[in-house]
Structure formats: structure tokens, C-alpha cells
Amino acid sequence: MPHLAELVANAKAAVEDAQDVAALDLVRVEYLGKKGHFTLQMQSLRDVPAEDRPAAGAVINQAKQAVQEALNARKNALESAALNERLAAETIDVSLPGRRMENGGLHPVTRTIDRIEAFFGELGFSVETGPEIEDDYHNFDALNIPGHHPARADHDTFWFDATRLLRTQTSGVQIRTMKEQQPPIRIIAPGRVYRNDYDQTHTPMFHQMEGLIVDKDISFTNLKGTLHDFLNNFFEEDLQVRFRPSYFPFTEPSAEVDVMGKNGKWLEVLGCGMVHPNVLRNVGIDPEVYSGFAFGMGMERLTMLRYGVTDLRAFFENDLRFLKQFK
């Protein structure tokens, strides 16, 4: 089949002349498609004597294979050239500044905890932690809270059984510390606490920070001076502060601390008092030798006052529009 060699030569020439993959595909269709030249060659085998058809068919298939190999080689070359051209056009200028990644930010309550820990750390306080699943002794009994006290009721406390509960305060950390350490003691105890309450100013879980000093000759004057300095530092202004007489089972005398707001109204910020002698006795400390003061404050409450947040629940909804304001 002399004309077959010419057909292969023409096909290879057309393949080499193709300048892109689309043009190359047209060559493939022209020569190898359903109506292509080589398909017509295969159809012409019907005119060849039966004994010669196998040999003639083999020759045509070899020719088709040669054209197919030429097509494949040219396609690879064109695709490689196109890739190199695209890569050259997309060359990265490494001297340009990169895209800056957006940094995350601390949660506003975490910021408050860090600020308070830093302040009291400079006064020699250490940070202590304790279990969130507490027993009634450390959460109530050791703190001079009797069995009939309203805080023990189911509507205020999450109980697991008759003796285990989710702690309602971090005061249990103070009890454990006083049992394990001898005075002088200076600690703060931050952590999550739980109470069965949910509204605009209360959530079932919130963060509390309690502080404790036990040493010889500790007086209410020491308590007032420490908390006054703390509040001025935290709110970054010279505040008008007042101590109102109050009642807590674990302190005597007890007080609630208010600061004067910008609207001319008093705002409650924390509770405090001198450690009750019964609490000291419960942990094996002689109240005739040692005295101390304790204070407790809600982290969300202080954060709301510092940043002007009106709904405590916003701290737990993970709304980025809200949280990004504190970055």
C-alpha cells in the first residue's frame, strides 16, 4: 500500500503543524475519527481478497499506531509548553510583602482574668485551682454554710447526688489550700462555677475569682486598702469606692464593695470580709493567732463594667462581630 505511507507522512506533517491542543484534535479527527482517512482504509478491506485481508489490516493498524504515537507526543509537547508559559506568567515576586494573616484575640473574660492575676501576682499572691465537681464539705460545710442555707437548694445548685455537686464558688480551693499549707497564705483562685440561673445578668456557668490572705495581724484595713488599689488599677481611674455591711457565712464582718459609676449611681463589683473564725478552725488554723480576709468577684461582671457590655450572655454566644471588638 504505497499510498498508505504517503497518508502517514501527511498525518505526521499535520501533527507537527498543529500549534495548540485544539488544532491537534482536529488532525486526530481528520485521520483517526469515525469518518477519517484510516477508517476509510479499514472499510476498503472489503475489496481485498479474503486471504490477503489479515496482512492488509495489520499494515493499516501499524500505520494508525504510528499516527497515534505522533499525536500523543505532540500533545505532550504542546501541554508542556503551555504549562511552562503559564508558570512563567505566574512567577511570584518574592520581594513583595506577603498577605498578612489575621491574628486571633483573647476573649474579653480571659483578658480580665489575666489583668487580675497580673495585679495580685505583683502583691505576692499565687494562683491556685481546684476541681469543678466538688463535694458538699468543701463547697458548704467547711465554709460555715449550714444545711438549711438557701444556697444548698436544688433551684440554686446543680447536684449529682446527695454529696456531689458542680461547685457554686471557688471557695473550696481556699479550704484545700489552708489544709495543705501553713500561714502565711496569699492566693487567688480563678475558675468556672455553676449556679442554676439564666437571664440577662446570670448564666448557669460563669467565671469567678476569689482571693485569700491568712497571716498574723491581718485587719479589715488591709482588706480595704488592697481592694481599693485593685479597683483603681483595674478600671484605670481613681474611683470612689464604698464598703457596705453585708452577710456571708464564711466571713465576719462582711461587706459588699461598690464603685461610683459615670452615671452617678453606685455599682456593686464584689463581696469580701474577714475570714470567719469557724472557717479557720475547720482547716486547723488557730483564729486566736491568725486572721485573714477573703474576697470574691465575678469575671463577667467586671468585664461588663469595664467594657460597657449590657448582656452577660453575649460572652458565651461566640458571635465574632462582638468578640472582634476586644482584639
Curated annotation (Swiss-Prot):
Binds 2 magnesium ions per tetramer. It comes from Serratia proteamaculans (strain 568). It is found in: Cytoplasm. Belongs to the class-II aminoacyl-tRNA synthetase family. Phe-tRNA synthetase alpha subunit type 1 subfamily. It holds the Pfam family tRNA-synt_2d. This is Phenylalanine--tRNA ligase alpha subunit. Mg(2+) binds at E252. Keywords: Aminoacyl-tRNA synthetase, ATP-binding, Cytoplasm, Ligase, Magnesium, Metal-binding, Nucleotide-binding, Protein biosynthesis. It comes from the Bacteria. NCBIfam families: pheS (TIGR00468). Its EC number is 6.1.1.20. GO terms for molecular function: ATP binding; magnesium ion binding; phenylalanine-tRNA ligase activity; tRNA binding. InterPro entries: aa-tRNA-synth_II (IPR006195), aa-tRNA-synth_II/BPL/LPL (IPR045864), Phe-tRNA-synth_IIc_asu (IPR004529), Phe-tRNA_ligase_II_N (IPR004188), Phe_tRNA_ligase_alpha1_bac (IPR022911), Phenylalanyl-tRNA_Synthase (IPR002319), tRNA-bd_arm (IPR010978). Tetramer of two alpha and two beta subunits. One of its GO terms (biological process) is phenylalanyl-tRNA aminoacylation. It catalyses: tRNA(Phe) + L-phenylalanine + ATP = L-phenylalanyl-tRNA(Phe) + AMP + diphosphate + H(+). The keyword Aminoacyl-tRNA synthetase applies. It is an enzyme of class 6 (ligase). One of its GO terms (cellular component) is cytoplasm. Its cofactor is Mg(2+).
